[in-house]
């Protein structure tokens, strides 16, 4: 499970710039709950051997009691609670402020691993950049410059050191290939808990906590129609006697970790609310993670024909990048439409692990090129020579040839469609990688 790092500090110390450096992306999952005046942003990153999740927060005033500052303080406390380690960001140029003392006192009481990052330290004399911040009494300190990218790797190493993470090269996870690891993802109140409790009740599940670190999500083993599953908690599973029941407790971190840990993700939408920004964010994360996915539109019984048509258009427009996924219309509370969902989950898992032989892929490639050649780019016309499988879950197809950097995205989509049809790939992303042969005369006149 990826460790979680929370960025905490008063306003304008450079937390967002640091967030962008640590994640190397402008994209983020946003906890856009109704009524929030300041969102928490979540992003993936990897500096060094370990991947991690970073939470960016607003300016923190621990003692704020009214208005926007109270809400921002609550958001920051939630981020800290979700995290494994805190990076406390201060302004090396401005020096210590009263707010810094308040935040340091708050963090010290929590006892959570904390690293102090003195940001904006570029150009300051070495040795004076962090010296005064020793007064805050928070242990490890480092002078960094988020805007210049200075000290980023060392900062991550310091932050993750207390967690004693295993070496990724040595970390081996024994998985039963016969078990499908399933995560039910979705916004708050779309019906995840209702659906999961329906399954729990139907299957009379006996649950247990799988061994692992304290960051591991609770997993529930069960069997449906002879197929073994492992349900990964995203809805706040709570033990009730010998079984678990789900409560509607939304956690972005738990959702991201569950998606990463799953073989198949069931993305639940609310028919009464349409496709929201957060639905699209979660769907994008599922695609980015390469997970097989099934879409289920809950509360279908609560909308009329006109609303259903609008919803279908919304799915096509906002979730068009998941057009390979099966869509089901269900009512979790009435237990309607749930049977076909299981069939699609199993089909998506099988597609994600489909083996594709090199001869068949190469024949398919030649037929595709014969039917429609790639577009010429200036004097270059890409030549596609052969293809082979480069991985599974998600399936990866590697195509070799010449001048492949001139292959258009539309042509890649054309090839993807041919491959999907040939191998019946439903419910899984398909990644196509193009590898051009080296031209020995490229740099010679």
Swiss-Prot record:
This is GTPase Der. Gene3D superfamilies: 3.30.300.20, P-loop containing nucleotide triphosphate hydrolases. InterPro entries: G_ENGA, GTP-bd, GTPase_Der, KH_dom-like, KH_dom-like_a/b, P-loop_NTPase, Small_GTP-bd. GTP 2 binds at residues 186-193, 233-237, 298-301. Associates with the 50S ribosomal subunit. Keywords: GTP-binding, Nucleotide-binding, Repeat, Ribosome biogenesis. It comes from Polaromonas naphthalenivorans (strain CJ2). GTP 1 binds at residues 9-16, 56-60, 119-122. Residues 3-167, 180-353 form the EngA-type G domain. One of its GO terms (biological process) is ribosome biogenesis. The keyword Transcription does not apply. Pfam families: KH_dom-like, MMR_HSR1. GTPase that plays an essential role in the late steps of ribosome biogenesis. Residues 354-438 form the KH-like domain.
């Amino acid at each position: 499970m990826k460790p979680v790092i929370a960025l905490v500090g008063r306003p304008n110390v450079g937390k967002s710039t640091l967030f962008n450096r640590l994640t190397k992306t402008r994209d983020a999952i946003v906890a856009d709950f109704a009524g929030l005046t300041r969102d928490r942003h979540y992003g993936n990153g990897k500096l060094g051997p370990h991947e991690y999740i970073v939470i960016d927060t607003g300016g923190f005033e621990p003692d704020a009691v009214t208005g926007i500052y109270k809400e921002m303080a609550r958001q920051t406390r939630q981020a800290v609670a979700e995290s494994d380690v805190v990076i406390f960001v201060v302004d090396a140029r401005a020096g210590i402020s009263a707010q810094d003392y308040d935040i340091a006192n708050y963090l010290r009481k929590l006892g959570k691993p904390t690293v102090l990052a003195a940001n904006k330290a570029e150009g300051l004399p070495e040795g004076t950049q962090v010296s005064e911040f020793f007064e805050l009494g928070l242990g490890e300190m480092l002078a960094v410059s988020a805007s210049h990218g200075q000290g980023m790797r060392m900062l991550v190493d310091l932050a993750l050191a207390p967690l004693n993470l295993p070496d990724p090269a040595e970390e081996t996870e024994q998985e039963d290939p016969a078990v499908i690891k399933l995560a039910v993802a979705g916004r708050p109140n779309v019906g995840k808990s209702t659906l999961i409790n329906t399954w729990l009740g139907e299957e009379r599940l006996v649950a247990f906590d799988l061994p692992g670190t304290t960051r591991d999500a609770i997993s529930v083993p069960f069997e449906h129609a002879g197929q073994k599953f492992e349900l990964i908690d995203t809805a706040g599973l709570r033990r009730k006697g010998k079984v678990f029941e789900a409560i509607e407790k939304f956690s972005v971190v738990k959702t991201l970790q569950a998606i990463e840990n799953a073989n198949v993700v069931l993305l639940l939408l609310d028919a009464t609310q349409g496709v929201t920004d957060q639905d699209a964010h979660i769907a994008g994360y599922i695609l980015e993670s390469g997970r097989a996915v099934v879409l289920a539109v809950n509360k279908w019984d609560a909308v009329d024909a006109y609303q259903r048509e609008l919803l279908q258009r919304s799915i096509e427009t906002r979730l068009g990048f998941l057009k390979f996924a099966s869509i089901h219309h269900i009512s979790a509370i009435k237990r309607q439409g749930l049977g076909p969902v299981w069939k699609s989950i199993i089909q998506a898992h099988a597609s994600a692990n489909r083996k594709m032989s090199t001869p068949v892929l190469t024949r398919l490639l030649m037929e595709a090129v014969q039917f429609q050649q790639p577009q010429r780019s200036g004097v270059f016309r890409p030549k596609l020579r052969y293809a082979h499988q480069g991985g599974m879950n998600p399936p990866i197809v590697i195509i070799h040839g010449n001048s492949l950097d001139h292959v258009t995205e539309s042509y890649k989509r054309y090839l993807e469609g041919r491959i999907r049809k040939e191998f019946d790939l439903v419910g899984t992303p398909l990644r196509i990688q193009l590898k051009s042969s080296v031209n020995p005369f490229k740099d010679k006149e």
